């Protein structure tokens, strides 16, 4: 996934770097159009060729069989979850805030981030919203976040069981808010580096993802483990639901070409066994819920 540009957005109210949003009486500046279009977005600066290579965040080699002839695509991704689970840290890593002095990054705020990536040979721009608050007075914002996303990252901390239980509640709320839509959702167990403080096992996270029909991944924002894979995955999940069958088949063929032979054999054998064994089918689904390249 190659970084092309980064933009961060916010309303006109000046704020300190570490402040979170509070909702003013007139919150119209928070409203986001449902279908962003390139013409409506602020002009962005492209990186110099050498910077483009140096700051590559790529998931592909140069032998991609898929072109980006249809142009750039925009996806609005919303971070939700309990306070203190690492949502803002994930957002900052995504936006390149930690190395912003070395990047061509225009800082307009702290709660909305925009970044253009190349995943499987095709450009996609993620507009990442990190405006979820847990205070009661922000109920309007909760409802707004539940409605505007093209995809959702429900984040919990593996060191905090209460945040895991809250993540399950948020998945139910999201299902109710978007009943007729097949919205991509990834359950994100953050802080995986804190092994000795773990309260939620990997198997529990996977089981929850299977029950609530979403994907699952564990990350560590502190050491940036699986963060790249997370944002690659959410792009792929949206594409799988939106794009034509033929286009997705080409992407799948590209991914399978890079897959090892032993892994192909295990996947094929697993499908055969699962046909006649419901328990095995559940186990395989649990194992596949972390594969962000398939539905």
Swiss-Prot record:
GO cellular component assignments? cytoplasmic side of plasma membrane; midbody; mitotic spindle; nucleus; plasma membrane; spindle midzone
Record SMART domains: RAB, RAS, RHO
Q: What is the effect of changing residue 269 to G?
A: No calmodulin binding
What is the role of the protein in this entry? Could be a regulatory protein, possibly participating in receptor-mediated signal transduction at the plasma membrane. Has guanine nucleotide-binding activity but undetectable intrinsic GTPase activity.
What organism is the protein native to?
Mus musculus
Q: Does the keyword Coiled coil apply?
A: no
Q: Where is this region: Calmodulin-binding?
A: 265-284
The entry lists its GO molecular-function terms as:
GDP binding; GTP binding; GTPase activity; magnesium ion binding
Name where it's found. Answer: Cell membrane
Q: Where does this protein hold GTP?
A: 81-88, 190-193
This chain is encoded by the gene named Gem
List the induction conditions. Answer: By mitogens.
Membrane topology field = Peripheral membrane protein
The record's listing under NCBIfam families reads:
small_GTP (TIGR00231)
Which InterPro entries does the record match to this protein? P-loop_NTPase, RGK, RGK_GTP-binding_reg, Small_GTP-bd, Small_GTPase
What is the protein name for this chain? Answer: GTP-binding protein GEM
């Amino acid at each position: 996934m190659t970084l092309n540009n980064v933009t961060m957005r916010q309303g006109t109210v000046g704020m300190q770097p570490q402040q979170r949003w509070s909702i003013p009486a007139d919150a119209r500046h928070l409203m986001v159009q449902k279908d962003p279009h390139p013409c409506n977005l602020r002009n962005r600066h492209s990186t110099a060729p050498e910077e483009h290579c140096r700051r590559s965040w790529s998931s592909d080699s140069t032998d991609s069989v898929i072109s980006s002839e249809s142009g750039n695509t925009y996806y609005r991704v919303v971070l939700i979850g309990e306070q203190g689970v690492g949502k803002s840290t994930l957002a900052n890593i995504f936006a390149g805030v930690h190395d912003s002095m070395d990047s061509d990054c225009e800082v307009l705020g702290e709660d909305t981030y925009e970044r253009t990536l190349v995943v499987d040979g095709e450009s996609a721009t993620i507009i990442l919203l990190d405006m979820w608050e847990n205070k009661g007075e922000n109920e309007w914002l909760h409802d707004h976040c539940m409605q505007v996303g093209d995809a959702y990252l429900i984040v919990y901390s593996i060191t905090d069981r209460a945040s895991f239980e809250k993540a399950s509640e948020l998945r139910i709320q999201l299902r109710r808010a978007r009943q007729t839509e097949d919205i991509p959702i990834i359950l994100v167990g953050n802080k995986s580096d804190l092994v000795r403080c773990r309260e939620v096992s990997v198997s529990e996270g996977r089981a929850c993802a299977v029950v609530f029909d979403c994907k699952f991944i564990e990350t560590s924002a502190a050491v940036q483990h699986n963060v790249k894979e997370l944002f690659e995955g959410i792009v792929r999940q949206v594409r799988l639901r939106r794009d034509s069958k033929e286009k997705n088949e080409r992407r799948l063929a590209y991914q399978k070409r890079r897959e090892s032979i032993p892994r192909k054999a295990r996947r094929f054998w697993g499908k055969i066994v699962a046909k006649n064994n419901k328990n095995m089918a559940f186990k395989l689904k649990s194992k596949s819920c972390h594969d962000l390249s398939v539905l």
